[in-house]
């Protein structure tokens, strides 16, 4: 089953975050994303022609995030949007983060 076919499950905490090796294995499924130096977050910078296109993309990401009940941090500027994903309750990465990343990728930039 692909990540886009899965649904984020609520994380109640008390679960260990992925270690670097696990995260790198999951990253293969979302190759445009990068792992931060602490292996606690994944991120991707999307480029656009202008601010309006970037904002439109952010609004579509918001709809996916609400549907999955998993909310990324988003930086927005002229011609770009950077999406940063982690599971805050465990201060690291969980399968949910990669599911959301795959669904964001499916939106197209």
Curated annotation (Swiss-Prot):
The chemistry this enzyme catalyses reads: (4aS,6R)-4a-hydroxy-L-erythro-5,6,7,8-tetrahydrobiopterin = (6R)-L-erythro-6,7-dihydrobiopterin + H2O
Domain of life per record: Bacteria
Q: Would you indicate the residue range of the signal peptide?
A: none
Give the EC number(s) under which this enzyme is classified.
Answer: 4.2.1.96
Question: Which GO molecular function annotation, any one, does this entry have?
Answer: 4-alpha-hydroxytetrahydrobiopterin dehydratase activity
Gene3D superfamilies listed in its UniProt record: Transcriptional coactivator/pterin dehydratase
Q: Provide the top EC class.
A: lyase
Q: Note the InterPro entries from the entry.
A: PCD_sf (IPR036428), Pterin_deHydtase (IPR001533)
Q: Keywords, A to Z?
A: Lyase
The yes or no answer to whether the keyword Lyase is present is yes
Q: Which residues form a coiled coil?
A: none
Q: Which GO terms describe its biological process?
A: tetrahydrobiopterin biosynthetic process
Tell me which family the UniProt entry assigns to this protein.
Belongs to the pterin-4-alpha-carbinolamine dehydratase family.
Please give the name of this protein: Putative pterin-4-alpha-carbinolamine dehydratase
What species is given as this protein's source?
Halorhodospira halophila (strain DSM 244 / SL1)
Taxonomic lineage of the native organism: Bacteria, Pseudomonadati, Pseudomonadota, Gammaproteobacteria, Chromatiales
């Amino acid at each position: 089953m692909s990540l886009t076919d899965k649904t984020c499950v609520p994380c109640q905490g008390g679960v260990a975050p992925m270690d670097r090796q696990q995260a790198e294995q999951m990253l293969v499924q979302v190759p445009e994303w990068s792992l931060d130096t602490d292996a606690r977050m994944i991120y991707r910078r999307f480029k656009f022609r202008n601010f309006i296109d970037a904002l439109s993309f952010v609004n579509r990401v918001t709809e996916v995030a609400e549907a999955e009940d998993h909310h990324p941090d988003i930086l927005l500027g002229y011609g770009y949007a950077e999406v940063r994903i982690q599971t805050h309750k465990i201060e690291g990465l969980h399968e949910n983060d990669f599911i959301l990343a795959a669904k964001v990728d499916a939106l197209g930039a």
